[in-house]
């Protein structure tokens, strides 16, 4: 998918959010009302994800955390940056066959019909302040809020070539909603699969807050109006 085509679908996504579902918050799930919080600054980010959410063998490249790809997706502490990861399948793969799994055992906390497929938000059982937000799924079976899912359970497949798969991880902290990189919460055993595809460290797919702040982006609503100078993508071997 070319960058021009991707931008076109981003604009379609934003238009659909505004006109059909009342807007697309860049903060994902706001979980503070249930009382579960986790202080990542004091305790660090736990590496508890033991199952990858997607068929890695079918993925060509991954956008970096805090990139300027897609649209603004930020939290209570940062703004105007994409604090999630896009996973783009290989060009020789039927994107709609790419399997999507629950990365953790938990409960479906929210579910939305998007302009392309279904968005599912999963509240972790082990760390109930952590939420996993997976976009653009073609569900294998109907799901509803409150349903239990197991780690590794196939949720469905990616919707298709009209857009990329993306995943965000949010944490309800004592000071507000915070987005962290999916790579920060995956176990070493899961990350080994990415190392086998050429990633030397988790930092390769994460733009630090300091680096992003030094290469400031501008936004009009959730639309990026500048792209910055930092590389947005990591291509896998």
Describe each model-derived feature in a short phrase.
Residues 20-23:
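C-terminal motif of bacterial Sec signal peptides marking the signal peptidase cleavage site
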Residues 2-11:
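Bacterial N-terminal signal peptides that target proteins for export
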Residues 119-122, 149-173:
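Short hydrophobic beta/alpha edge segments that flank linear recognition/processing sites
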Residues 172-215:
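Short peripheral tails and domain-boundary helices/loops at the edges of structured domains
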